[in-house]
Amino acid sequence: MKKIEFNLLEEPWIRVRTPDCALQEVSLTDALLHAHEYAGLAGELPTQDVAVLRLLLAVLQTIFYRVDLEGSPSPLTDEEDALDRWGQLWEEKRLPEKPILDYLTAWRERFWLFHPERPFYQVLEAQIGTEYDAKKLNGEISESRNKDRLFQSYGGTEKDSLTYGQAARWLLYLNGFDDTSAKPKGKGLPSVGAGWLGKIGLFLARGNTLAETLLLNMVLLKDGQELWAPPCPYWELDQPRSGERTEIPLPDNQAALLTLQSRRIFLYREEGRVTGYRLLGGDFFERENSFCEQMTIWRKSQEKRNAPLVYLPLRHDPAKQLWREFPSAFAVESSTHTPGVVRWIAALRDYMDRHLFIQFESVGAAYGDKDFFVNDTFTDTLTFHRAVLDTTNTETRNKITQEVLFCEEIAEAVGDLAKEVAKSAGGQGVPETARARFYFAIDQPFRRWLASLDPEEDMDEAVLSWRSQAKGIARQVGKALVEEAGPSALVGRCEKIKKGNKEIKYHAAPKAFNHFLWELKKIYEEKGGNKV
């Protein structure tokens, strides 16, 4: 029997970034106790950081649902109690030592990466699962197989095996973002799809320190409204589930969800390094209306006209900037389900400085071929005044949403212009490329405008100023498309269109550009309600 090795509470394995941008590896205990000293997590991929963050959040949720800041037993009893406890933690700006050490000391034996009976985030039954080498465990290498790389991040021994610290980080990532390549061992088992974190559009808040990030995402109230059931993280189970592809009820507490075992995994080691692993499908639940998940954007789904409306987690589009998802993430309409973390932060308005800037981040993995492999990972951020989320500022969010929708309409008009200009030169335009060009041009200006908004100031004036800027950017992009088309597009060409009687349509860049300007005017004057 191999020896017990590598306790995650004591050994360094979590990668953090200091304020001066230095990287360190620290233990789970140190990551929590010194979280106020770190700028944030700094793993190999943003998806890995989210997996580690959720583990840390599960620990904090469990502790502070049960005890106060001094470590004395004090279970949360109502919503006001939860908000007050969070407010006390936020005011401290650091996580209290005693309750954290008391809890981790009590559960130390459940945090061994290698253990003959209870290896962390693993089960012995997975030894019959699909076999993979260390390169597959390393998400950085696995993901990079789908790209041409001039310079490899790993080579030699580092490519064929992992340190225990690396393996621990990638173990969490694998549990959350694993693809669908593993073959089931049992017969007639359901398809579980990608790991839970790979199925959703991850959406979280970022603070100035790791401690702030943890507190902002420590959602003590479901959707900012009601208490969860008592916490029960995976490691507290008397007997962890080990069955292959097991459907479970929706978790009723955050600790259980944050430590969901989407996969059954068993790591193999040799001479102090991890050389491979075996894997089976693990726990899963229905995605429909799975509102226990607080860190995702949602989309409405209604398959039939009279069928009940349901919500599904919305995966992020890697080609879509986060500000373009503002309507889904922050909308006011009752028919839209905003992310739980957004509702939670809105509920904290009395405990936070209204002038505080909040940064939200989207994180995702882009899969290929029915989630059979990971093509890429991506992240994006969005920053604005916390006061924008107040219930008294619904009109502000409505105005921002409207401007996002106007930008989408402009992008469509730019695409139509590109197609028409190309026809004027005798070619076939690619509207998608032109739309992407417009979004690139307007991306940073929109972010700056959003960050500058203060709900206490004149929003109508801010909106008019933005519309003037957006219209100018659109004109510049449109003008560039016309100029790049060349002289032949200015002269134009005739196209015969067969619709009943013969009809001839004339294509010319000047004509197309004038129509484009008319479209801009129609978007902002007819639909916007104010002239620019």
Regions found by a protein language model. Give the residues of each.
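Extended alpha-helical scaffolding segments
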Residues: 1-146, 173, 178-532
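Beta-strand elements of modular eukaryotic interaction domains
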Residues: 151-153
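The −1 position to Zn-ligating cysteines in a subset of zinc-ribbon hairpins
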Residues: 159-162, 264
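Cys/His-coordinated zinc-binding microdomains
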Residues: 164-167
